[in-house]
Curated annotation (Swiss-Prot):
Other information: 'Malvolio' is a character in Shakespeare's twelfth night, who 'taste(d) with distempered appetite'.
Organism taxonomic ancestry: Eukaryota, Metazoa, Ecdysozoa, Arthropoda, Hexapoda
An individual GO BP term: copper ion homeostasis
Name of the featured protein: Protein Malvolio
Coarse class of the protein's main subcellular location: membrane
Family: Belongs to the NRAMP family.
Annotated glycosylation sites: N41, N359, N574
Region (Disordered): 1-34
Gene: Mvl
Any Gene Ontology CC annotation: plasma membrane
Tissue specificity: Expressed in macrophages and in the nervous system.
Biological function: Putative transporter required for normal taste behavior. May be a nitrite/nitrate transporter.
Species the sequence originates in: Drosophila melanogaster (Fruit fly)
GO molecular function: cadmium ion transmembrane transporter activity; copper ion transmembrane transporter activity; iron ion transmembrane transporter activity; manganese ion transmembrane transporter activity; symporter activity
Length: 596
């Protein structure tokens, strides 16, 4: 029996650990076969397939310090360090950097507290995703494969793929703009878009050199971003008192609708749907003995500390960007920036980019390219090139983690494993074709303004990651003793409602700004109805996961919502992934050579 059978959808009639054993003789043997098939289908010890992303060749061993009776071990923390920092890169992609710029230019430091609390909310959601992977040994997409019917599972996969491709387009745009700046416009935007194809495949082969070396590379890219944007923060020297006030005073006096929209955009940019799928899979790279409750608790503890540190670093980097452009661009018009650039080499570029209206009162609409020009005019060419290096690091690191997220999504939802190069070729081509056309035939403004549309698209996908995460981590049959408590459930649901509501508001405003009419408006309305209905379906499933007996006993819910023909399901509370301790490497007696 191949190791890939651990991914097959369970067949009918399998008995859980608490189920009946059947008759003696042949019935008993068949019962044992079915019980073993359940273990193969739902084991926490998944033998990595040859093409599985990220951790196919090795797992990081966790040092055993139990004999020394050490309460907190930095050796163990170091062993668990890696997945959280890879996850945090999604908080630092070019779309986030541009959102930081725009919020600083529009509201100065007034909505820094929104960035802070959005990061905290993101941490709480990432904690749930990581716990799911640690406790069950299955990541979020693999769990969706087991817990949803075929049609909703496919819809979920399509939605997450849209989010991944949207994020990939932002990364392509950011990388192309960075190359354009660093090459002093020698490499055109469309050339930078094409270069992203080549460099992505180059990076894909780096994980062949070892898991820890790959994680070190990601850490290096984060360090480059911290140094680059930290340099800009130091040379711009914003008022530290105002920065602290903006962080810790949750208020925004004299803020107009544009500032409110920027605040909503910050939340939408920070909390990325595909990142929950990514993080739940990355934690599987550590060798954790799930048969021991103590080891699982320990892993949850150290992963949470690591994620907290990683997101703290990402928050500081985002803070640097907001503060730099809040200090330099807030309240200024395009003409003000052009005046600053008057005696600089980038004066002509500034005149073409910072175009003012007739009255000379147009407020700056910040984007990645304009940010580089502004820094170059204000602090010299070195500042512009350092900005370009930071954006390049953001684009490259996000590209790689996006590739892994796509690989995990495809492996989990479809039980399909493609080689990484094939997966990247398909995703990257889908992202590059529209981006290349814009870069080839449109202006820089069209390329950068696409980020707003992409942020709106990704905001729509958030429920398709948040609701399954809360549902599975709140299900006792899945999480065992690690299930969310009542307080955790209430807080998670309330926070998710707030975040999803904020994101939907952002989407509605963006759609209104597009002034959609006629047949296209009718299509948008139909999509909105289907979108609401599917979210309602996911909420019903979540309520059943949380133990709502009325829903679980409903024939309609049993037929259309709950997993069927699955010995492990939310209907079988005696069977938990956390307590299965059988390796799929061993074939039990009576099953050798049998195709289960």
């Amino acid at each position: 029996m191949s190791s890939n059978e651990a991914y097959h959808e369970p067949g009918a009639g399998g008995d859980g650990p608490g189920g009946s054993s059947g008759a003696s003789g042949g019935g008993s043997q068949r019962s044992n076969q079915l019980h073993h098939q359940q273990i193969l289908n739902e084991t926490t010890y998944l033998k990595p397939a040859a093409k599985q992303a990220y951790f196919s060749d090795e797992k990081v061993l966790i040092p055993d310090d139990d004999s020394t009776n050490v309460g907190f071990s930095f050796r163990k923390l170091w062993a668990f360090t890696g997945p959280g920092f890879l996850m945090s890169i999604a908080y630092l992609d070019p779309g986030n950097i541009e959102s930081d710029m725009q919020s600083g230019a529009a509201a100065k430091y007034k909505i820094l507290w929104v960035l802070l609390w959005a990061t905290v909310l993101g941490l709480l959601m990432q904690r749930l995703a990581a716990r799911l992977g640690v406790v069950t040994g299955l990541h979020l997409a693999e769990m969706c494969y087991r817990q949803y019917k075929r049609l909703p599972r496919w819809i979920l996969w399509i939605m997450i793929e849209i989010a991944i491709i949207g994020s990939d387009m932002q990364e392509v745009i950011g990388t192309a703009i960075a190359i354009y700046l660093l090459s002093n416009k020698v490499v055109p935007l469309w050339g930078g878009v094409l270069i992203t194809i080549v460099d992505t495949f180059t990076f894909l082969f780096l994980d062949k050199y070892g898991l820890r070396k790959l994680e070190f590379l990601f850490g290096t890219l984060i360090t480059i971003m911290a140094v680059s944007f930290g340099y800009e923060y130091i040379v711009s020297a914003p008022n530290q008192g105002e920065v602290l006030e903006g962080m810790f005073v949750p208020w925004c006096s004299n803020c107009n609708s544009n500032v409110l929209l920027q605040a909503v955009g910050v939340v939408g940019a920070v909390i990325m749907p595909h990142n929950l799928y990514l993080h739940s899979a990355l934690v599987k790279s550590r060798d954790i003995d799930r048969r021991q409750t103590k080891k699982v608790s320990e892993a949850n503890f150290y992963f949470f500390i690591e994620a907290s540190v990683a997101l703290f670093v990402s928050f500081i980097i985002n803070l640097f960007v907001v503060a730099v452009f809040a200090h330099g661009m807030y309240g200024k018009t395009n003409n003000d920036v052009v005046e600053v650039c008057k005696d600089k080499s980038m004066y002509e570029d500034a005149k073409m980019s910072f175009v003012d209206n007739v009255n000379g009162t147009a407020i700056i609409d910040a984007d990645l390219y304009k940010g580089g020009l502004f820094l170059g005019c204000t602090f010299g060419a070195v500042a512009m090139y350092i900005w370009g290096v930071g954006i390049l690091a953001a684009g490259q690191s996000s590209t790689m983690t996006g590739t892994y997220a796509g690989q995990f999504s495809m492996e989990g939802f479809l039980n399909l494993q493609w080689p990484r190069w094939c997966r990247v070729l398909v995703t990257r081509c889908i992202a590059i074709i529209p981006t290349f056309c814009l870069a080839m035939f449109s202006k820089m403004e069209d390329l950068t303004s696409m980020n707003d549309i992409l942020n709106a698209v990704m905001s729509l996908q958030l429920p398709f990651a948040a609701i399954p995460t809360i549902a599975f981590t709140s299900c006792a049959a899945i999480m065992g003793e690690f299930v969310n408590g009542l307080g955790n459930k209430i807080v998670s649901i309330l926070l998710t409602i707030v975040v999803i509501g904020v994101n939907l508001y952002f989407v509605v405003v963006q759609v209104e700004n597009m002034e959609i009419k006629g047949g296209l408006l009718a299509l948008v309305c139909i999509f909105a109805i289907l979108y609401i209905l599917f979210n309602l379906y996911l909420v019903i499933h979540m309520a059943a996961c949380m133990g709502n007996q009325r829903l679980m006993n409903s024939r309609w819910v049993q037929r259309f919502v709950l997993p069927s023909q699955n010995s492990f399901s939310i209907k079988n509370a005696n069977s938990t992934y956390a307590r299965i301790a059988t390796s799929s490497d061993q074939e039990p007696e009576g099953l050798a050579g049998e195709d289960a």
